[in-house]
């Protein structure tokens, strides 16, 4: 099972302080573990702070976007999920058209026409060790659904959790993750 380019959608009763009502975009999943970016948790960092560090202006298309809190790991670093993939110093391809980049060069070029079409900027990331995500899935902590670029890039972050459930065709209020466990 490879969940790269999928959303993890937290079950409604998840109690973890960070992951409660989270949608995590899985960027890499293999036998060694998984890495993803939470796409619906705003961070205290502003776009002004990010772009002033690069000496570039915030692109008009991103002026009202929030910087996401991608996860609790390496919160001092920035990560960009973007299209097209491009040729950056430190990127991993997630799908045919989406990449995760952690190098500054993508931020420095984001306002250049044609360099980056769509982008979600985050600080930190989420990770799971070998077998950990599979155990959490078996414990009914998460639902999975193939990623949707519209949810990832176009829908306001506060609506992404509901949109991911809608893509699954499920009403989150009707779910109880403890079903089937004695």
Swiss-Prot record:
Transmembrane parts of this sequence = none
InterPro entries per record: AlgH-like
Q: Which family does it belong to?
A: Belongs to the UPF0301 (AlgH) family.
CC terms in the record's Gene Ontology section: cytosol
| The name this protein goes by in its record | UPF0301 protein NGO_0569
The lineage, from the top, is: Bacteria, Pseudomonadati, Pseudomonadota, Betaproteobacteria, Neisseriales
């Amino acid at each position: 099972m490879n969940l790269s380019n999928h959303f993890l959608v937290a079950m409604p009763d998840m109690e973890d302080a960070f992951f409660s009502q989270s949608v995590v975009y899985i960027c890499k999943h293999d036998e060694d573990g998984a890495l993803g970016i939470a796409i619906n948790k705003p961070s205290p960092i502003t776009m002004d702070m990010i772009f002033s560090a690069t000496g570039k202006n915030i692109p008009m298309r991103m002026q009202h976007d929030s910087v996401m809190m991608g996860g609790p790991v390496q919160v001092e670093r920035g990560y960009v999920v973007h299209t097209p993939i491009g040729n950056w110093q430190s990127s991993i391809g997630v799908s045919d058209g989406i990449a995760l980049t952690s190098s500054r060069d993508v931020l420095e070029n984001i306002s250049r026409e044609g360099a980056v079409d769509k982008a979600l900027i985050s600080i930190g990331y989420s990770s799971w060790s070998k077998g950990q995500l599979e155990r959490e899935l078996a414990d009914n902590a998460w639902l999975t659904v193939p990623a949707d670029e519209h949810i990832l890039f176009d829908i306001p972050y506060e609506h992404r959790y509901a949109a991911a459930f809608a893509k699954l065709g499920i009403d989150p209020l009707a779910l109880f993750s403890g079903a089937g466990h004695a």
